[in-house]
Amino acid sequence: MRTWKALTPLLKLLVLTQLAFNVGFYAVLPFLAAHLGTAIGMAGWVVGLVLGLRTFSQQGLFVVGGWFVDRYGVRPAVLTGCALRVVGFAWLGYADETWTVIGAVLLVGLAAALFSPAVESEVARQAVLWEEDGHGPRTRVLALFSASGQAGAFMGPLLGALLLTVDFRTTCLAGATVFVLVLAGHARLMPHRIPGRVATRARGGVRVLLRNRPFLSLCCAYGAYLLAYNQLYLALPQEVQRATGSQAALSWLFALASLLAVCGQLPVTRWAGDRLGLRRSIAVGLLLVAAGFAVVAAARPAAWTGAAGLLPATGYVLLLTLGQMLIVPATRAWVPDLTEDGRLGLYTGALSSVSGLIVLIGSSAGGCLLDLGLPPAVPWLVLAALPVLAVALLPHRAEGAGCEGDTALPR
């Protein structure tokens, strides 16, 4: 793979780190709800609370983790985050009461709030430098980074399901072991000082961020995409249940999405890099996502069931995944061009926190929409309208290094 061979040792470390992060995470978390409900006997609302607290402690605190990265550097953030994840997973494996489970999942979420902004912001910064050295568009690096994460998300549940034949504690300890290995690898290989990265001591970064309209517009558009993506876990299960009478086909649809993302991310990004800039890549991706919802909306009045009933859902998953492959690398590539000098970590964290808040609010509204008893096509048409409206939110300004030949200053 030409892109991989051209990467610097630091970029290779960061890409492999994303793979390991997701293997360790997805080996445990997909099985948490079932463990809490069956093995521990928690009520459904308590399980929901626990899962919500984990999401909040991660997405909600990304902006804090980004500030930590800008102030203290990538290495301390990654090492601290990995150490917290090891403790959190080990604790979760032995937790058997509500308060201990909550403490463990808060640590698990806080860990990601530290190491994810560190890795994501440094990958974006290094991708800009890689581009400026003449290796090609930065989106190729970020596409490889996204594909590695998807590969980890695909392999993690397989590892977890295998270990779950022993028990949940073994699965948690295996997840902790993955992060021990990541911790050891970064302690040995991550530079103490990364050339070009300067710690930011000045205050006022959040105030400047809140006045950065192009960046906030991008956050809102990205939040609309994430809200649409979240329908994989909200609207899609209902559609599969309606069409087949069970949710057994969901696992196959999720596997299809993961395999498509792993195998197609780099070719799609290379195609988009030759033809589209950053804004147009995101816009086309959002329109593909909208088309996925529209496919289901068009088919719902026919009320197909069985294998035929799964065809619209499959089309939705395929179009959503294609949109994702355009949106995610382009968004990450655009952030450095909208960022104040020395604040890339803060802005990377804010992208996740702001969009996560949009998903939190929008998911509740989406759930109500699906429960209102409207004509079957209406909820899907409303969901299709959201990505279309998000296109109008995309900033109208110079795209920087979106395509070959463009330039941008590293941050």
Label each PLM-derived region with a short phrase:
Residues 338, 342-373:
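A late C-terminal transmembrane helix in Major Facilitator Superfamily
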Residues 104-149:
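Cytoplasmic helix-loop-helix junction between adjacent transmembrane helices
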Residues 1-8, 187-221:
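Juxtamembrane intracellular "pre-TM" segments in multi-pass secondary transporters
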